[in-house]
Amino acid sequence: MNGQGASADPQLQQFIEIESQKQRFQQLVHHMTEVCWDKCMDKPGPKLDSRAEMCFVNCVERFIDTSQFILNRLEQTQRSKGSFSETMTD
């Protein structure tokens, strides 16, 4: 090796970050599927009835809404911490 290691390769770092994001997304989808399945499926049959279908739609939409709310809240918190620390250093 050249002594710099893998941390010096920006392309490798970007690839690892993208793969990590893919993995987190897959975990989120798996979790959402599991939660909504347990909530909406009473008895699996040959096809989805309209009640179960509507339950899945609502479950996924609430999951997305909640995730978006949490992300927005975290972003606001980070911004307020950043502006607070900037005023402290001025």
Swiss-Prot record:
Keyword Protein transport attached: yes
GO terms, molecular function: metal ion binding
Record's subcellular location: Mitochondrion inner membrane
Domain notes: The twin CX3C motif contains 4 conserved Cys residues that form 2 disulfide bonds in the mitochondrial intermembrane space. However, during the transit of TIMM8A from cytoplasm into mitochondrion, the Cys residues probably coordinate zinc, thereby preventing folding and allowing its transfer across mitochondrial outer membrane.
Quaternary assembly: Heterohexamer; composed of 3 copies of TIMM8A and 3 copies of TIMM13, named soluble 70 kDa complex. Associates with the TIM22 complex, whose core is composed of TIMM22.
Stated family: Belongs to the small Tim family.
Key words, A-Z: Chaperone, Disulfide bond, Membrane, Metal-binding, Mitochondrion, Mitochondrion inner membrane, Protein transport, Translocation, Transport, Zinc
Motif Twin CX3C motif: positions: 36-59
GO cellular component, one term: mitochondrial inner membrane
Main location: mitochondrion
Organism of provenance: Takifugu rubripes (Japanese pufferfish)
Protein name stated in the entry: Mitochondrial import inner membrane translocase subunit Tim8 A
